[in-house]
């Protein structure tokens, strides 16, 4: 579709980090080495379908992101679960800011920061603690990841491996058909 060549796969590559339930179809495609080409293709694919966006940020980025979003009048909710567990959730994205959100999604994903776009109907998002050994928890602190529960006619999109792989997990929302 568009410039991307999607392949249907059986499971999400890293299911421990990308926790998505009620999935009927999963598609993947390799992204290009060209930032503008990827952003343009993402915009063509998802511009009319974006519903929600969630991004994980470092504590040092929280204030700047808040200021930037406030200047654009984009509403958001912040979940600050301590240390490195800060999530911005956007439940309503103005159509005028969809391009900005797509660029942010791609930009933070290629830096190995966690971000997900939801498409179609609203999905249920809960933050879930990853179980680690007490020793690892003392070293790195608690770690939370969003758990996404899809509903019919919804999907979520994320980029893995420092911007190399685009994954779409859907529930009867066929956006990859050619």
Protein language model regions, located:
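Structured alpha/beta or helical-core interaction and ligand-binding surfaces enriched in interleaved
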Residues: 1-165, 169-178
């Amino acid at each position: 579709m568009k410039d991307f060549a999607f392949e249907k796969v059986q499971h999400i590559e890293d299911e421990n980090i990308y926790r998505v339930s009620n999935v009927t179809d999963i598609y993947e495609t390799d992204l290009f080495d060209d930032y503008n080409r990827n952003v343009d293709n993402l915009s063509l694919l998802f511009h009319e379908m974006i519903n929600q966006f969630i991004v994980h940020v470092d504590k040092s980025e929280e204030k700047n992101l808040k200021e930037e979003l406030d200047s654009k009048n984009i509403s958001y909710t912040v979940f600050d679960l301590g240390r490195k567990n800060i999530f911005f959730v956007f439940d309503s994205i103005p159509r005028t800011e969809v391009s900005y959100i797509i660029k942010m999604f791609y930009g933070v994903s290629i830096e190995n920061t966690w971000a997900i776009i939801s498409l179609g109907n609203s999905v249920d998002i809960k933050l879930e603690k990853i179980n680690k050994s007490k020793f690892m928890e003392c070293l790195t602190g608690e770690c939370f990841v969003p758990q996404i529960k899809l509903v019919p006619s919804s999907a979520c999109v994320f980029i893995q491996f420092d911007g190399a792989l685009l994954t779409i997990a859907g529930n009867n929302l066929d956006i990859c058909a050619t």
